[in-house]
Each structure stands twice: as structure tokens, then as C-alpha cells.
């Protein structure tokens, strides 16, 4: 997988002035004696993040489920417990619709009674299994959903069979969900203690749903291993992940930009963008610091946000992911019944037009709109590319947060709403 990075801005950026800082933080990310080693399991790849025995066990379970005509998996989780898997499924498969293929449904990521009710109604005619993902089991959204859905599954097929179709991904050390799994004799997959939720897609958290959907997990791992090696140097000129991190830092610190918009030209990247927003939002948004991570899908959002991006306030820059080779393509043929300018495009493909839109929009926004643009060109949307891109952003995120002067691996602000909600519900936390 090839990844190219191109900066389109009139702003002069001197990266080499920061090489000493990069060296220091690179050591902190990679040194076995780092004070943050308890959070760096994702970077100890594949030794810590990948458990071959557990993946083999998952494969056997998935094979058994499919043999028993269980073709729907309900993944219950919120934040990093589901965003990575959802991003991977859409990135690799596209948005469908699909016929006669295993289906993965995501629940427990909101407190919407309407969404939960409608999905349960849909499941009434399906043979489904459950994979609940939570490090502790105390997060309210997945906890409520799991309790309701597990009862529904028991009502449908009985408790004995329901136990064989329910899989728990959680800490194997302690937690409410671990106790539930043990007391009900449910299959358990491990949430690795040294890997935070937003960094966990390249682990058992993401792998079970992907295996169920018949995604080639081995290729995802191969792509991530290659990226891990590629971005293992501290040299800014040779490490694109660090160059991206430094670009973001300079936009924020030296030029006072407050927002980064991640832009993609494929609708199936919507949830990849959502995963990216959590990764950077939770890692950097603390101590009154950090770029606000926003996203858009072009050309769709050009018809809603395009005016603002071109002519509105200039407090943002754009990072663009462009996929060089589309998953599928369609040719445009002349239609004599339509006497329009579109007929002049006959012989071209839809992806060729999309590419021209990308070129035109990037030029308009960077040159005429005076918005700095950074372009990440990736080869395709294969499993290997997904693994590579995830590792690229995770390494960039850690470095970016250290440059900013914050801890990339905690999220103390999230506890505030949880504490207030607990008070409202009369809970002890």
C-alpha cells in the first residue's frame, strides 16, 4: 500500500526546527521504559495487540455460527468499541446493499429508544448473535442495550441457546461485564488493558465483527505491520505520520487555526471519518487545547458546506483523503434521449469525474479560498490499506498530542457528563 502526502498552502513551514522535539517524543512512544508504556499496547504491534490463539478461536466460532444459519451479528458498544469495526466494514466492503452476506448491526451507541425499538423489530425475523464490547461494562448506553437485547434473545430462543450466541469482549481482570459473562457462562474475548478504546480496532475489539463479516483480518494485520515498520523512524523527512502530526501542530500553534476538517470523496468513508474524530478529539481536546476535528464528504457536502469553506471565516484547514483506485467504476454513455452537456462526457467514467472534482475543489479552496490543504492519497480501499491507514493515524495522533503538551491516552472530560447522569439516575459511580 502506498500513501502520499502533499501540502497545498502558501504558508511557509519549517519542519526541521522541531526535529529535536520529535526525537524526544518518538522515544516516549517507542521506549520500553516509557512512562506511558501502560497505554502503548497498540504500538507494540503485533506482539501485544494480536493474540493468534484468540483469533483462531474466533474463526471457529464464526464458522459454527454461519453453519447454523446465524447470519446477523449485533455488536453492542459505543465509541472505540464500535467505531473502528464499523469504519473497517464500510471502508472494505462499501455501503451495499448486500444480499446473502453476513450482516453486522451496531447498537448501544446511543440512548435512542426509537432506534433500539426499530432494530429489535427487524431482528424478530432473524437468526442473530450478540457481541457486547465494553472494557468495564458500566457504560450506560451498551449496558442498557445489552440487558434489553439479551432478554429479547432469551425470549426468542431460550436461555440455554442464547448463551451459545452471546459473546463478550471485555477486560479479563475485573468489571461488571466480566462478572456477567462468568456467571452466565458466556464466551469471553479480551480487551487488552494497555490499549485504549479509540486505539483498539486492530485487536480483538475489532476482529470478531470483521471475521463474522468475512473480512480478511490477516491482510488488515499485514497492512498495519508494514505501516508500523514504515513509520518507526524519528526522521520528519522520512516519517509521513510525524510530518502530518507536525503540520497539524503548526497550523494550530503558529497560525491559530482552530478546526481541522477531514474530507473524503467516498460516502463509505463516513465512519472512517467518525473514527478519526474520536481518535483525535479524545486524545487532544483537553487543558483548553486542541484542534476541533470535523469532517465532510465531498462532493455531497459541497452543496451544503461548500459556500462556507470557500468564503466563510478562515479558522480551519482541510485534510483530504483521496482513494486513487475506486472499488468499482461505471462508464458514461451517450444517451440520445437526453440532449444535455452530460453527453459530452461520454467515454469517461464516474471516478474520472470525481477525480476532476477533487482537483478543482482543492485548487479552489487552497488558492482562491486561502484554506491550507493537506492531501493524503491512498492506493485503494483494501484490507491492507485499512490496516496501514489506521496505524498511520494512530502514530500521528500520539505524536500530535505530545507536541501539544497533553496526554494522548486519557479522556477525563468524558467523566463529567457520566457523573452528572449518574446523579440524575441515583447511581453510585
Curated annotation (Swiss-Prot):
Active site: 282, 303, 418
Subcellular location: Cytoplasm
Class in the EC hierarchy, top level: isomerase
UniProt GO molecular function: carbohydrate derivative binding; glucose-6-phosphate isomerase activity; monosaccharide binding
Catalytic activity: alpha-D-glucose 6-phosphate = beta-D-fructose 6-phosphate
EC annotation from Swiss-Prot or TrEMBL: 5.3.1.9
GO BP: gluconeogenesis; glucose 6-phosphate metabolic process; glycolytic process
A GO cellular component annotation in the UniProt record: cytosol
Pathway(s) of this molecule: Carbohydrate biosynthesis; gluconeogenesis; Carbohydrate degradation; glycolysis; D-glyceraldehyde 3-phosphate and glycerone phosphate from D-glucose: step 2/4
InterPro entries referenced in this protein's UniProt entry, alphabetically: G6P_Isomerase, Phosphoglucose_isomerase_CS, SIS_dom_sf, SIS_PGI_1, SIS_PGI_2
Keywords: Cytoplasm, Gluconeogenesis, Glycolysis, Isomerase
Family recorded in the similarity comment: Belongs to the GPI family.
Purpose: Catalyzes the reversible isomerization of glucose-6-phosphate to fructose-6-phosphate.
Name of the protein in question: Glucose-6-phosphate isomerase
Source organism: Mesomycoplasma hyopneumoniae (strain 232)
